[in-house]
Amino acid sequence: MASSTLLITLLISLSAFFLRMVLAQVPATCASRLLSLAPCGPFVQGFAQLPAQPCCDSLNQIYSQEATCLCLFLNNTSTLSPAFPINQTLALQLPPLCNIPANSSTCSSSFPGEAPSDSSSVAPPPSSSTGSQISQGAKNNSRVAATPVAQMAPRPTSFMGLGYGLKSSGSKSEIQLTIFALAAILPAALLLI
């Protein structure tokens, strides 16, 4: 019993360590907000046809509280890819599917920790809680073109959405393998309790 408790403690500690390593790449103000997008995982990894309602709720909350974090998620999906592989084409479909007036043209190509280069590039959050219109691109802004949406198949090399088997080199693949191992061992360890 003591050994299983020690094993569980070790696994949780290692999981937290690797999660902190991944989130260290994300600005501090966005890290906790982006964690709330976990319900979007099945959709942005190609395992679900539509995003779940908790995903849309979290996305809307991020958009209304910190739109730059939504921009970070949409423009820099590779930031979270070691632990949370994201298909950027699918991620860009989230705002219209969740009735959020943001799309790929909403954010300029900002980088982690950097605000968008144009103050008009982030649409203001909706002022009322009544249903918002789906944004299909720019309407009255001739300098911004609508972005076409392409349907992509899920990545065949992704195993259970953990990125196991992705072509990678160095410590990134080691982190992916470690996270995969933790995800495989943790449920079995919890059954021992």
Curated annotation (Swiss-Prot):
Residue span(s) of the pro-peptide: 169-193
Record-linked SUPFAM superfamilies: Bifunctional inhibitor/lipid-transfer protein/seed storage 2S albumin
Protein name, UniProt field: Non-specific lipid transfer protein GPI-anchored 10
Lipidation (GPI-anchor amidated serine): S168
Recorded family membership: Belongs to the plant LTP family.
Cellular location(s): Cell membrane
UniProt biased composition (Low complexity): 116-132
Entry keywords, A to Z: Cell membrane, Disulfide bond, Glycoprotein, GPI-anchor, Lipoprotein, Membrane, Signal
Signal peptide region: 1-24
Glycosylated residues in this chain: N76, N87, N103, N140
Residue span of region Disordered: 109-140
Protein topology in the membrane: Lipid-anchor; GPI-anchor
Cysteine disulfide partners in this protein: C30-C71, C40-C55, C56-C98, C69-C107
One Gene Ontology CC term in the entry: plasma membrane
CDD domains cross-referenced by the UniProt entry: AAI_LTSS
Function according to Swiss-Prot or TrEMBL: Probable lipid transfer protein.
